[in-house]
Amino acid sequence: MNYADKKILVLGMGKTGISMVKWLSRAGARVSVADTRTTPPNLELLSQIVPLETIFCGPFKAELFKDIDAIAISPGVAIAEPLVQAALQQGVSVIGDIELFAIALDQHAPPGTKILAITGSNGKTTVATMVGEMARNTGWDVEVAGNIGLAALDALMQRIDTGKWPHLWVLELSSFQLETTSSLRPNAAVVLNLSEDHLDRYRIIEEYAAAKARIFPDPHNSCVQVLNREDARVYAMAHENSKQLTFGLSAPAFDDEFGVLPSGSDLWLAQGTTRLMKVSELAVAGLHNAANALAALALCRAIDLPFEPLLHALHIFKGLPHRMQKIAEFNGVTFYDDSKSTNVGSAVAALNGFRKNVILIAGGDGKGQDFSPLEQPVSKHTRGVVLLGRDAEKISQAIQGCNVPVHRVATMDEAVRVSFLLAERGDSVLLSPACASLDMFNNYIHRAEVFTTAVQGIEHKFILTAQTCH
């Protein structure tokens, strides 16, 4: 599409919005920008790209949407916004950053450039990072972008300006980005899993699933579908005329299946009946990370990358901050930071990765989720649960039949202190909130920092007490 002299309204001034402003401005569009926040981030940066008189802060007004050719919408702005819906009904196109990226890639990328696309409720960032490391280990130049690291358009502009094109683009994509994407043609794409999330944006989980399914182009495209065969909603996304590879923690029977094979006392990552590497050789903990590794392997094999460097990369992959990250161990108790667990599915996966008794710290803003899936793993894996935040009571009600002690606290410091008192030698204290953080913290990273500081405080007191006793 030729954007020269087109009047385009960009909604949202976050990282993605700024990337769209930069891309559209260099394409010659007449750009205006709006954000519902009165003092949005990046305002000073934005004023260096477009004239101040084209920047509007505060509630959206109807006049902003008049006489425009298109709306470029940030993931944080809902398409259900009434003024956006009114514009759609008048024939105004609504696009997002990934749609702009896909169109541009068709125009600029050299032949043979590969694309792997990743979405899901949980594990997206881990799998995208894994795939990037695995593909780099084969000698390829790889760009990992999208809902991770650089915005896709920022990464694209850097590559255009340097003239150095990657062999492979690895794109982590959110459901919000996929809502406005129709031109992306990945060589292979995966939906890792689906659990209740973002139900503050979607009326029902089926709407959320439909947005995720947009990662797969029409059935006549050559995209390989990588599907979680143990998630019914994901498996139902299979196109009759497309090639599929599946992954899961069950034993694989055929060459198009990746899974876990038991052998004696060991568990192996496998393709079909071929054992690839022991699960215990992964540097990341938990069976959910074994599933992540299998999804990453399936994606890489879909574009014929060789096994040996892929497996070596998996062997040394250390994981990501705030995702089942071990932060301390003292008095026989291990503390794990899984603050990135912002939905129920993620917390369930974290708990199911433990064999030892766990003291679970959970709670926050549940975003309308159903917490009942926590009941079984809480019953099976926890010695106690410590709850805080806005939806602590809802979680407490959901797990009341578990016959596990539940403690309500007001602060993270108190949560850590109570957890340490509940824990016995050999136990783990796990922060896996199953909720968003904004009711009490700036973001999930801030929540993790407060947790880590509290753990360090307890550890310091424990060491001082031990020294005094000696």
Curated annotation (Swiss-Prot):
It is an enzyme of class 6 (ligase). Pathway: Cell wall biogenesis; peptidoglycan biosynthesis. It is found in: Cytoplasm. InterPro entries: Mur-like_cat_sf, Mur_ligase_C, Mur_ligase_C_dom_sf, Mur_ligase_cen, MurD. ATP binds at residues 120-126. Pfam families: Mur_ligase_C, Mur_ligase_M, MurD-like_N. One of its GO terms (cellular component) is cytoplasm. GO terms for biological process: cell division; cell wall organization; peptidoglycan biosynthetic process; regulation of cell shape. It catalyses: UDP-N-acetyl-alpha-D-muramoyl-L-alanine + D-glutamate + ATP = UDP-N-acetyl-alpha-D-muramoyl-L-alanyl-D-glutamate + ADP + phosphate + H(+). Keywords: ATP-binding, Cell cycle, Cell division, Cell shape, Cell wall biogenesis/degradation, Cytoplasm, Ligase, Nucleotide-binding, Peptidoglycan synthesis. One of its GO terms (molecular function) is UDP-N-acetylmuramoylalanine-D-glutamate ligase activity. Its EC number is 6.3.2.9. NCBIfam families: murD. Belongs to the MurCDEF family. Cell wall formation. Catalyzes the addition of glutamate to the nucleotide precursor UDP-N-acetylmuramoyl-L-alanine (UMA). This is UDP-N-acetylmuramoylalanine--D-glutamate ligase. It comes from Nitrosomonas eutropha (strain DSM 101675 / C91 / Nm57).
